[in-house]
């Protein structure tokens, strides 16, 4: 056993590890009282995520409470947008709002190439401070939104139930949408490189809304741009593990495996055994406990964790939820999740 690198990083690289690493999407957030107290003092989400002292403090809150094996930057997938010339705000209980949705060629041509060091230096500062603080006790994770999901937000102007506006663009003006997606792919790759250079050891790409696409449209509007991001990042940072997550991914799981990422993060609607069977053996898996289960009993939580880890045996596996932890989740149950996750291999025993 080597302690020269964090457990989660070694697992993500496919090395033999002493136990299954565990972290949680959205592990810093509204379910924690310390976060809610801080939010009451700083009600602007953008201030909380763009002030480096606040972002660092929030990123560290779950580590100080639960000691997960990964500490993820507290930020948002839309954080790079202003650096490209797209302003946004995040309204509590309503979500993101884009002041001027991007729907014309002139708007797309006016977008700026992202220069993260100039437009969002707070991200680099926080990642560096996190690395310094956690050392080898946890891996530092960075993340981005994938091109399709970013496009969905900026074209729709807000969260959507049916994505009618961006789908209208996709099917009426596909060349226009491809120009936007290509701009995002280049900028997001630049942003990921910046995160890695600043201290991120593992990075995750969220294509949250790609599950709204048919498989054929996924192949046209999402997968090529996911792959473009991966190819660009891997060309300069080949040893940094990359994770891909899509909410509602059951219909495109095999396609996700062809994007060049190292790990596929499964949502809870895919059985872990089925997910492993549908993906090439060289790919790792992450997940995939239903976040709603954390409203249940400790016994139920432990049972599902054991089930997920047992079914992932033989693969490189990072234990996580199948989606972000939900607001209102009892903190004691989050603690059960982390404590069980760290002990799950002992609960299962040595049987494969």
From Swiss-Prot:
Uppermost EC category: lyase
Segments traversing the membrane: none
Annotated keywords: Cytoplasm, Decarboxylase, Lyase, Porphyrin biosynthesis
Domain of life: Bacteria
GO cellular component, one term: cytoplasm
UniProt site (Transition state stabilizer): 76
EC number: 4.1.1.37
Localization per record: Cytoplasm
Reaction(s) catalysed by this chain's protein: uroporphyrinogen III + 4 H(+) = coproporphyrinogen III + 4 CO2
GO biological processes: protoporphyrinogen IX biosynthetic process
GO molecular function: uroporphyrinogen decarboxylase activity
Gene3D superfamilies per the UniProt record, alphabetical: 3.20.20.210
Binding site for substrate: 26-30, 76, 153, 208, 323
Pathway info: Porphyrin-containing compound metabolism; protoporphyrin-IX biosynthesis; coproporphyrinogen-III from 5-aminolevulinate: step 4/4
Keyword Chaperone among record annotations: no
Family named by the database record: Belongs to the uroporphyrinogen decarboxylase family.
Record's function text: Catalyzes the decarboxylation of four acetate groups of uroporphyrinogen-III to yield coproporphyrinogen-III.
NCBIfam families registered for this protein in UniProt: hemE (TIGR01464)
Name of protein: Uroporphyrinogen decarboxylase
The species this protein was found in: Prochlorococcus marinus (strain MIT 9303)
